Amino acid sequence: MFTKPDNLQAYLNSADKIITHNGIFFDFPVLKKLWNITVKKSQVVDTLVLARLYDPSIENGHSLDAWGERLGYYKAPYKQIWSWMTWTFLDKDNAHLPFDEPVIPLLHHYCARDTLVTAQLYKHLEKEMQHDFSEKSKELEHQVAIIIAEQERNGFKLDERAASQLLCELKAKLEAHTTSLQSIFPPKVQSNRVHKTTGKALADIVEPFNPGSRKQIAERLIEKGWKPSKKTEKGSVIVDETTLEGINIPEAKAIAEYLMLQKRIAQIESWIEAIESDGRVHGKVITNGAVTGRMTHHSPNMAQIPNSGAVYGPECRNLWTVEKGNSLVGIDASGLELRMLAHYMNDDEYTHQVVSGDIHTTNQKAAGLETRNQAKTFIYAFLYGAGSAKIGSISGGGAKEGQLLIDRFLRNTPKLKRLREKVSRIYADKGWLPGLDGRKLLVRSEHSSLNTLLQGAGAVVMKQALVLLKKELNRQKIWHEFKVNVHDEWQIECHEADADTVGQLGKEAIKQAGIELKMRCPLDGEYNVGKTWKDTH
């Protein structure tokens, strides 16, 4: 046990590897804050990072408790240790004991079990990952985790006053809209009721419409002529935003607006609740949270901030801002998913159309669709593994028309057809796919295999570009703070004078990532500068 920071720092400096579980996001920042202890990035091995790379969606998660259970090494959960501690704070006369007397032995035990489980987990992962995961993929995930841990500590400034004002406006709109819905859907009245025993007349039962009840929404819309096609496993009608958008009944539009207002209010309330004493929201990120290798977000989910094309999206994005004298730089990869497709197709003409031509018109002709907009919807639905019925709905048809579209499109893009077949064969043979940087991509189903491959490649590209950009910003000593890393987008706060430099460096990092990863389709990016997220994306 170390009781002096100098002794601990010297010990850590002498180590080749420092193995922790969640050290990047917790232990190392705590040591830095309390004792000013620093750890070299090259020394860090984080079993949480490795475990999430190994299997992002493993049942029961990646806590040391869960891994201890899997590996047969039970560790006392923190809540149990805390419970013991609270009981041992008091002596027989209920007088408080000195803090360190009862607590330190318990914490020693807790720490020892943590260390044991972490060591066993490291050995387990080292063995399991030696063949199907490259050193490059492990190194990349550690580098990204270090950057994102810093991003979490940075936080993103939210204009609390403007957020509260928008919240009040939306609540007023929701109240007015709720009143209007009572006119659209009048109360149901059960009249002419009599008591079963006495035969006496009973008062009418008046049931007002409850727009918060999905069951009532379904019943009322069916009465208006809606014929639902989607139901849950238990037979309940599915009512959600997507379903309501497809119902060509005025009353459905009114319900959709109610649910949208309700959702926006809940979102803004969660952002305001998340503001910390520094005026910023410190959203949490799992850097390899999805099976594709993409990051996932929570507390709050920064990937679900409404975009500028959504209803009240501009107003919501306008709430996220920077400190006085600074700028926000939004950087996006250009056409990332289609460039990943071009890389794997290895078709010179298709690559040319993606990079320099009009790929959506090319796809429109290949599929035989009427409009370019239909082609844009079609290609992404196709790549996401949509079924023939969904594909058919794009052109106003059904499953039969959808299958004809798919067949025609594949017939006219033979290299895509061959890629699709190859990916399906690999999945059928292995049950997983090799990722762009030599990682193992676990695939949920055959129909999602191509999409997993493409999204996985895009995730690796953006992570590699992130590492390159961070390195260059540090090399040039440009002050910056990452605010958001979502899919193919970065939001970065910097001094106003450096904004264009940061944007250009971001574009170059994306290009360079493509070169380093030996992409057969050149990559590019674009950026915008402003004061709020509305300005930059």
Residue ranges and their predicted role:
Residues 19, 44-45, 211, 328-332:
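Short hydrophobic beta-strand that contains or immediately precedes a catalytic carboxylate
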Residues 235, 271-276, 303, 308, ...:
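Short, contiguous acidic/charged loop-to-helix segments that flank catalytic cores in large enzymes
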Residues 502-510:
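Short amphipathic alpha-helices in soluble, non-transmembrane regions
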Residues 1-5, 11, 16-126, 364-367:
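Active-site-proximal helix-loop-helix substrate-binding element of RNase H-like nuclease domains
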Residues 204, 282-283, 287-290, 365-486, ...:
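Conserved catalytic core of nucleic-acid polymerases
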Residues 70-74, 84-312, 327, 337, ...:
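Conserved "right-hand" nucleotidyltransferase catalytic core of DNA-directed polymerases
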Residues 24-37, 52-55, 218-225, 334-349:
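Short active-site loop/helix that positions an aromatic residue
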Residues 287-370:
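Function-dense linear segments that define catalytic or interfacial modules
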